[in-house]
């Protein structure tokens, strides 16, 4: 199956270091090898919050407009918002490299956890100021 890879990091620093992006590439590469996926294009958003809808991000919009299923390393790289994930599940095909066989129920549960983590990150950031 031909797929496109989508990578996202929240800060410019993560993008400049390459560490977050490289880890995502490795997850997707491994999953592609295991499941016979062929990555035909790659899209990358750097310095973009997981709270922004994927279709409103420069590279995210292009990835989903490509027409191939989109693969992300982890669900929180796609979004940290339950509504975003639920909407994408209805309209687009995507896979998560770290849980390629996850069903709709499991994806919803992980989306709730990702959204909760976004709130925790925000609280920790505010407390540190």
Predicted features along the sequence, with ranges:
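Short, structured surface patches at the beginning of a domain
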Residues: 1-128
């Amino acid at each position: 199956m031909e797929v496109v890879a989508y990578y996202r990091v929240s800060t410019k620093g993560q993008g400049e270091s390459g560490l977050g992006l490289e880890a995502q590439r490795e997850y997707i590469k491994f999953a592609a090898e295991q499941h016979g996926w062929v990555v035909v294009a790659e899209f990358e958003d750097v310095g973009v919050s997981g709270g922004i809808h994927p279709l409103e991000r420069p590279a995210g919009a292009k990835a989903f407009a490509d027409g191939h299923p989109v693969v992300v390393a982890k669900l929180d790289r796609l979004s940290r918002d339950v509504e975003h994930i639920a909407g994408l599940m209805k309209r687009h095909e995507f896979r998560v490299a770290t849980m390629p066989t996850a069903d709709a129920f499991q994806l919803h549960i992980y989306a709730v956890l990702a959204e909760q983590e976004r709130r925790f990150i925000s609280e920790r950031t505010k407390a540190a100021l």
